[in-house]
Amino acid sequence: MERFLENAMYASRWLLAPVYFGLSLALVALVLKFFQEIIHVLPNIFSMAESDLILVLLSLVDMTLVGGLLVMVMFSGYENFVSQLDISENKEKLNWLGKMDATSLKNKVAASIVAISSIHLLRVFMDAKNVPDNKLMWYVIIHLTFVLSAFVMGYLDRLTRHNH
């Protein structure tokens, strides 16, 4: 009975495979939205105010960071929790594949969230005249919470690695 339960639990990791594949579909949706934004801005590029263009560019950078985060979580999560990726030797392989454990993935995700939050906060500040002060305060508090969380996670990781 114990062996059956252990084998069933171990095999259940494959339930995550469609979830990671779903992230690739989310990446496709993000790419479509990215190019929709570019197609939307190109006809108006010469009549746009510089600040409006910068806001669009910040949105594109934001989407790019989210896309990178999706790729990192998709590949690293699959390799850490489901199965090793079998990439043929003659194909280009990302140099971090197979080297990122769950802790380093968590730290990279936290750093990505801080970067995404920074871009979002910059967009908010560029339009600060249209954002109520209490909302600005909450954006800053939430961003600082992300920064503090990432710092604490990195610090705790460093402590545990140093003690082992």
Swiss-Prot record:
GO terms for cellular component: plasma membrane
Domain of life: Bacteria
Subcellular localization: Cell membrane
Pfam families: UPF0114 (PF03350)
InterPro entries cross-referenced by the UniProt entry: UPF0114, UPF0114_bac
TM stretches of this protein: 15-35, 53-73, 136-156
Keyword annotations from UniProtKB, A to Z: Cell membrane, Membrane, Transmembrane, Transmembrane helix
Positions of disulphide bridges: none
PANTHER family the UniProt entry points to: UPF0114 PROTEIN YQHA
Database matches in NCBIfam families: HI0507 (TIGR00645)
HAMAP family listed in its UniProt record: UPF0114 (MF_00143)
Family that this chain belongs to: Belongs to the UPF0114 family.
Name assigned to this protein: UPF0114 protein YqhA
Originating organism: Escherichia fergusonii (strain ATCC 35469 / DSM 13698 / CCUG 18766 / IAM 14443 / JCM 21226 / LMG 7866 / NBRC 102419 / NCTC 12128 / CDC 0568-73)
